[in-house]
Amino acid sequence: MPQVPGPRPEPRAGNISQVRIDTSSPEQTEALGRRLGKLLRAGDIVALSGDLGAGKTVLARGIAEGAGAAGYIASPTFTFIRAYRGAVTVYHVDLYRLDRPQQLEDLGLDELLDGTALVVLEWAEKAGPLLPPEHLWITIRFRNGDDTRAVEFLPRGPRYTDVVQTVARECASWR
């Protein structure tokens, strides 16, 4: 599938705010998402990246649950966007099937990023210039074994640095 041009943040050597947490099962990945979701609020943006099947939707489900979203959290692959109401409105966006920049405008992604809801973007590298400078970039990578994942947090901005440091402390026993 063609890629929509856009930034793909990569870790830089010496970036002390970057954190990696390894998870050993989908359940643990979802639990990590719940811990993260409890720290997030309306206006926050979480950008998820990783190979197909790496666990982006599993982590997104945990984030939405942790933020207080009601109901079953499902992948929006074919609907592109799912909205969940609760303590915080959560927009779960899946950009996997996008192949043209114009489709971002058609979806109204810029309107979703207006600060009124928590937005979780899967395949965030396709969001291109619509992704604001301050956000939380998370890359999920396959590790040794079928279920083991490396969840790499790269905060962009002081708010997200604080969030990541808190999650890292809470999950210190997982590393």
Give short role names for the model-derived ranges.
Residues 2-6, 10, 14, 19, ...:
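Short phosphate-coordinating micro-motif centered on Lys-Gly-acidic
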Residues 30-39:
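Pre-Walker A adenine-sensing motif
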Residues 46-48:
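Hydrophobic anchor at the beta1->P-loop junction of P-loop NTPases
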Residues 53:
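Walker A (P-loop) phosphate-binding loop of P-loop NTPases
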Residues 56:
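Conserved lysine of the Walker
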Residues 73, 77, 83-123:
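Conserved nucleotide-sensing/catalytic segment adjacent to the nucleotide-binding pocket
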